[in-house]
């Protein structure tokens, strides 16, 4: 009996050691790129920090990136939150599956296949070289609709039925029941949307011609690779907001689930 317990403890200890080693390897693999990004920035000279056309170019690109990220996430969440709720509330199972399959189809469709139709649409409505054109082309996010649909399906239908019996309208059901319950999903979706908009590259390359409207990802791509320290410093400034936002989102979501 004691021998079996000792063997179990030894096996458990070996498993913990193995998991610890694997975790350490994974940590090193994830941390090394950050080290290679941060440490070269200490060798940069202050006079070389702004070797672009001007400091205002970098600030303008940062502003454009912030506009795309903040305005984009607001538009996407309003559309996806409403669409996810509407699909979940459809009484017909076939109709619900039709919308879900449509979202999955657009989710699996390569983004490059939509570039030409999007370009033609923006050209015909006169929004080709503008940030609002980019915002419109990124407003529909199938993955976000599916996420909010999944969140809505997890809500007990008796909550909606009881509120409906008390005279609540669909707007009240949406605002008082659905939105508060799915708030953690909204937080996660907002972060993923901001991260995607922050790193947007293909659409700006295709739809924007005026350099004053370029996001920061375009400016970084066009920087010369001769000065690696400068590029690392600007990349670090580029990712710092996302890192801060990530930890804020993790803290917010974990606190909500623990409540």
Where would I find each of the regions flagged by the language model?
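Short, Lys/Arg-rich, polar N-terminal cytosolic tail immediately upstream
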Residues: 1-13
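A structural signal for multi-pass alpha-helical bundles of membrane permease subunits
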Residues: 15-259
């Amino acid at each position: 009996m004691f021998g079996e317990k000792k063997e179990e403890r030894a096996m458990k200890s070996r498993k913990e050691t193995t998991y610890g080693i694997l975790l350490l390897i994974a940590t090193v693999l994830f941390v090394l790129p950050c080290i290679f990004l941060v440490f070269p920035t200490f060798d940069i000279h202050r006079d070389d920090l702004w070797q672009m056309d001007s400091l205002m170019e970098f600030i303008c690109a940062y502003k454009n990136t912030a506009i795309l990220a903040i305005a984009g996430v607001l538009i996407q969440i309003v559309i996806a939150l409403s669409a996810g709720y509407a699909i979940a509330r459809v009484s017909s199972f076939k109709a619900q599956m039709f919308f879900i399959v449509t979202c999955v189809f657009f989710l699996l469709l390569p983004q490059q296949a939509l570039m030409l139709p999007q370009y033609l649409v923006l050209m015909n409505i006169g929004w080709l070289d503008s940030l609002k054109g980019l915002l419109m082309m990124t407003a529909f996010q199938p993955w976000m609709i599916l996420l909010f649909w999944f969140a809505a399906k997890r809500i007990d239908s008796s909550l909606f039925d009881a509120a409906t019996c008390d005279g609540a309208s669909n707007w009240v059901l949406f605002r008082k029941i659905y939105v508060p319950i799915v708030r953690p999903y909204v937080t996660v979706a907002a972060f993923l949307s901001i991260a995607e908009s922050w790193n947007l590259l293909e659409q700006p390359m295709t739809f924007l011609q005026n350099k004053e409207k370029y996001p920061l990802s375009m400016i970084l791509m066009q920087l010369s690779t001769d000065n690696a320290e400068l590029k690392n410093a600007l990349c670090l400034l580029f990712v710092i907001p996302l890192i801060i936002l990530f930890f804020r989102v993790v803290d917010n979501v974990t606190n909500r689930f623990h409540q």
